[in-house]
Amino acid sequence: MPTFYVDETGFTGEDLLAADQPIFVQATNDFTASETQKIIDSIFSDVGASELKHNNLSRKPAHRERIVELIRLATSDPKHVATWVAHKEYAAVTLVVEWWIEPLAYQSGLNLYKDGANHAMANMLYMCLQGFWDERFRRKVLLAFQRMFRARTKERFDECRNLIEKAKDAVLLDEYRSEILRYLWPSFELLGFEHVVGLPQHVFDIALPGLVRLGLSWRGKHEGPWEVIHDRSSNMAKQKWLWDMFSSADIEPAQFDGPHGASIFPMNVINTRFADSMAEKQIQLCDLIAGATSASLRLPEGDEYHAKLFDAGIQNLIIDSIWPTPDVSPEELGKAGWDGNKVLEWLSEVAAKKKAPVQG
């Protein structure tokens, strides 16, 4: 039975604005125990570490070379390895669109999931909040929304509302800045504090969406059934019940042909468990790949390690991402004719049948 191993790096829970960890990466592989041991023996035999961890190995140039060799091996036959990455500050923007702007648009009869309008909105806000103000202002706005969505208190609601209204009043004579803020302030009046209180729990936690995307990628390669083994130290255990719901083999079949290929249900996962990386060494390889992917995205282009990772093809392991671009048209986004609302409606039906709430 195929088994997929998963580990992550850069997870900070619902705090997507931690300056020291701007990137979140999940990595997965389906190497067998014998294949994994062969990889470790052939590449890392001279490392002398009881456990292979990217944070430790990447400190020494010689060990970085070993990691690059692992990436080169993975990209030579990429069907065994996949990564999913998220730019966490941009992810915060997408969640403001998802839980603050889209609900009001829906009430007004607009479908932001059609033709990737939600994606375009997030790109526009991310670029314009910095372009028309600065990076500091964008982070200040996102931090206020993050605090509001996490605390769900009237104090945090008023704090966020006052920030946006003060910014709006300061640019009344500036047509362009006023237009940007017009996407943010109406929900305070028209949705109100009750909307914030009624949101699902953990809406700023992006670990589950990444794992689902990886799961759908594997489902496209293997009909299943299959097993998932996640690192025991992962916080995914908190949302295992929701993962189990959408990955199980007993939900009704469905297929959604989207911009990144087909999403096929059921995923046919018959078991998900959390294991010690010392016992399941495939998890150690996931840690190395996730850490290297994060480094390749964080380090400047002139950095030697960055250059070697890209030369090894690490970018080719990324199957999907939450990442900002200046693209806003359906054609640029690759979402012309795509209606993401159909997937959400189906997921809501699945959750309703299982009598469990949908989370974003």
Could you tell me what each predicted segment is?
Residues 1-360:
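Phosphate-ester processing/binding pockets and catalytic centers
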